């Protein structure tokens, strides 16, 4: 789950997608938002999808969340349906932007944020 361009800063679209996920209220959201400027990409999925592993500088404060997957989203358009989950490690730091497909093909590009319907986990 690494490549020649890893580690690297978040791309604009990765940052925008995470910000969209963090736009819905849930416990720990504000702390996770504050981690975003400290987040970098440290790995990616080998299947070719756009899932990325994240690392956060520990200078940022950890978040207290109710689960390791505090927020998720549906992505849909006329051609496909998929999902996104923002994962948090056991120490309270962003650790993965997981993008999964409901179909056979992996999601190879992040969608426009307008197509992301975020919701907190219950």
Regions found by a protein language model. Give the residues of each.
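N-terminal domain-onset segments
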Residues: 1-72, 109-122
């Amino acid at each position: 789950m690494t490549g020649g361009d890893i580690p690297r800063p978040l791309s604009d679209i990765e940052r925008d997608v995470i910000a969209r996920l963090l736009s819905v209220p849930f416990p720990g959201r504000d702390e996770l938002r504050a981690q975003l400027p400290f987040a970098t990409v440290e790995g990616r999925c080998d299947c070719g999808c756009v899932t990325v592993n994240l690392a956060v500088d520990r200078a940022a404060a950890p978040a207290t969340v109710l689960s390791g997957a505090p927020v998720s989203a549906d992505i849909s358009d006329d051609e496909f349906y998929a999902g996104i989950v923002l994962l948090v490690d056991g120490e309270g730091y962003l650790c993965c932007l997981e993008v999964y497909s409901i179909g056979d093909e992996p999601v190879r590009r992040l969608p426009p944020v307008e197509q992301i319907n975020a919701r907190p986990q219950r």
